[in-house]
Structures are given as C-alpha cells and as structure tokens.
C-alpha cells in the first residue's frame, strides 16, 4: 500500500482506463477500438474463458487487428513494394509532391 495514493487524491482511476478501453475515458472520447472491444466483451461475458476462446474468436480477432494493425501494415508494405518495383522498372513516376521536389506552398 502506497504512503500517498495519487490516483485516489486526484479522483482518477488509471488502472481501469488502461485495462479496458470501453471504460469511461477522461475526456469522454471513445478509444479507437472501443466498438470491437465491446463486441468481444459482450460475446465472452459469462461463458467462461475456454468457451469464449472458441465461440468469440471472430470478435477477438477483429479487436486484435484493430489494436495491432498487423494485416493493415502487411498490406501497406505490399503496396509500397509494388510501387518501388514499378518505379524501378520505369512504369510509374510519382507526382513531384510525393518525392519532395515541389516547392512548398505559401
């Protein structure tokens, strides 16, 4: 037990904010993955962790993708590789504002 409980003195509950994104946020702004987490929690609530692992797999995968963005990053990496390949082959020339050659606007 801490000598001076800062969270209690300030009236904030950082532990709840950091564990569940669906919890009430300090500025009333929902987190990016609020909807996905809520669906997963609603699906898994009351059925136990073993059943929830099987029955709520789709909801959990959606929530995980929203948090980590692994599929999105993989897709962006593939697009970037294709773009670089086309530039190297001479089939695509990026616009000047993409390569930093255009003068800045005033």
From Swiss-Prot:
InterPro entries: NADH_UbQ_OxRdtase_FeS-su5. The gene is NDUFS5. A motif (Cx9C motif 2) lies at residues 56-66. Residues 30-74 form the CHCH domain. This is NADH dehydrogenase [ubiquinone] iron-sulfur protein 5. Disulfide bonds join 33-66, 43-56. A motif (Cx9C motif 1) lies at residues 33-43. Residues 84-106 are annotated as: Disordered. Its main location: mitochondrion. Belongs to the complex I NDUFS5 subunit family. One of its GO terms (cellular component) is respiratory chain complex I. Contains two C-X9-C motifs that are predicted to form a helix-coil-helix structure, permitting the formation of intramolecular disulfide bonds. Pfam families: Ndufs5. Mammalian complex I is composed of 45 different subunits. This is a component of the iron-sulfur (IP) fragment of the enzyme. Accessory subunit of the mitochondrial membrane respiratory chain NADH dehydrogenase (Complex I), that is believed not to be involved in catalysis. Complex I functions in the transfer of electrons from NADH to the respiratory chain. The immediate electron acceptor for the enzyme is believed to be ubiquinone. It is a peripheral membrane protein. It is found in: Mitochondrion inner membrane; Mitochondrion intermembrane space. Keywords: Disulfide bond, Electron transport, Membrane, Mitochondrion, Mitochondrion inner membrane, Respiratory chain, Transport.
């Amino acid at each position: 037990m801490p000598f001076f409980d800062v969270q209690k003195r300030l009236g904030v509950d950082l532990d709840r904010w950091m564990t569940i994104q669906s919890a009430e946020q300090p500025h009333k702004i929902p987190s990016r993955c609020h909807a996905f987490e809520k669906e997963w929690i609603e699906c898994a609530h009351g059925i136990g962790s073993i059943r929830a692992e099987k029955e709520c797999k789709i909801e959990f995968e959606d929530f995980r993708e929203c948090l980590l963005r692994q599929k999105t990053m993989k897709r962006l990496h593939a697009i970037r590789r294709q773009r670089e390949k086309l530039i190297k082959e001479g089939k695509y020339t990026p616009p000047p504002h993409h390569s930093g050659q255009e003068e800045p606007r005033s």
